Amino acid sequence: MANPLYQKHIISINDLSRDELNLVLATAAKLKANPQPELLKHKVIASCFFEASTRTRLSFETSMHRLGASVVGFSDSANTSLGKKGETLADTISVISTYVDAIVMRHPQEGAARLATEFSGNVPVLNAGDGSNQHPTQTLLDLFTIQETQGRLDNLHIAMVGDLKYGRTVHSLTQALAKFDGNRFYFIAPDALAMPQYILDMLDEKGIAWSLHSSIEEVMAEVDILYMTRVQKERLDPSEYANVKAQFVLRASDLHNAKTNMKVLHPLPRVDEIATDVDKTPHAWYFQQAGNGIFARQALLALVLNRDLVL
C-alpha cells in the first residue's frame, strides 16, 4: 500500500496527522538501526537555503547523501539570480522544480515555503524554516528525541523557555505534541517574547493544560522535558535584545531537583542561555538531539520520495 506521505508537501507540522507523525518516527528509528545508503540512489534533491543555516542545512544534506541521493543547491541567495538579478521566488522555484525530485527550502519570509508549493508542480517542497513561522523537520527530530528518551509522546510535562514569540521551533513542537494525549505545557518567557496567543487558543480549544511562569525554578521538579531557546538577536531591535537576552539562563546548579530522566533540549545554536557546566550533566541532551536530525530528515525524505517504502 502506498504510504500517505508520498510526494506530499511538508510545510507545517499541521500538514501531518498523528498517524503520519508516528509513521515518520517509526521510519526514523528503522533508519537509525539499519542504514540504507542506496535508498534514494537515483534521486536528485535541491537544497535551497535563502537564509543562513548551519545545523539544518548540513543535517539535511548529510541525510540526502547517506541515502544515496544527489544534491544540488545553494546556501546564500545573494549569489543566485533571485539575489543578484531580481528574479522572483516563483520563477526560481518554477525552474528548480524542472531539475529535481524534491526541494528542501529555508527562507526568511513567513509563508514563502507555502508559496513555493504553488510553483513546484508535482515536486514536493519540504520546509526547512520560513521566518518565525514553522520549522517542521526540527519538530520531527524533537519528537524523535523525546520519544527515545521518555519512551512516549503522551502524558508528558514540557517546559519551554526563552524566546517563545519568534522561536518557530516552539510553535511547531507545541502544535505537534498537542496531537498526543495528556500532555501539559509550562511557558517561561519575558512578556515581550511570550508564546503567541494563537498557540494558547489552540491549546484551550483542545482542552490541554498550560500555564505561564516567570522562572525555570518554579517548574523544574515537574517537567520531563525542558526545552530551552535562544533569544533571536536577528529578529529584535538592539535595545530589546539587550533587555531580555540574559533573563533566563540555565546552570547546572538549577538542576538539583530535576527528575532523574528529565532531558534538556535546545534547537541550537545556543548563546548564553545554557551554561557550559550543564553539558556534563546527564540531563543535557541537545547534542544527541541535533544528531537525531539526520534520522528524522532521512525518514521524511524516504517517505516523500518512495511510493511503497519497505524497510
From Swiss-Prot:
One GO MF term attached to the UniProt entry: aspartate carbamoyltransferase activity
What are the EC numbers? 2.1.3.2
- Key word Transferase present: yes
List GO BP terms, alphabetically: 'de novo' pyrimidine nucleobase biosynthetic process; 'de novo' UMP biosynthetic process; amino acid metabolic process
Keywords associated with the record = Pyrimidine biosynthesis, Transferase
Instruction: Name the InterPro entries on file.
Output: Asp/Orn_carbamoyltranf_P-bd, Asp/Orn_carbamoylTrfase, Asp/Orn_carbamoylTrfase_sf, Asp_carbamoyltransf, Asp_carbamoyltransf_Asp/Orn-bd
Where carbamoyl phosphate binds, per the record, is at: R55, T56, R106, H135, Q138, L268, P269
Coiled-coil residues: none
A Pfam family cross-referenced in the UniProt record is OTCace
Q: How does it assemble?
A: Heterododecamer (2C3:3R2) of six catalytic PyrB chains organized as two trimers (C3), and six regulatory PyrI chains organized as three dimers (R2).
Family stated for the protein in its record? Belongs to the aspartate/ornithine carbamoyltransferase superfamily. ATCase family.
Q: Which PANTHER family match?
A: ASPARTATE CARBAMOYLTRANSFERASE (PTHR45753:SF6), ORNITHINE CARBAMOYLTRANSFERASE, MITOCHONDRIAL (PTHR45753)
Please report the name of this protein according to its UniProt entry. Aspartate carbamoyltransferase catalytic subunit
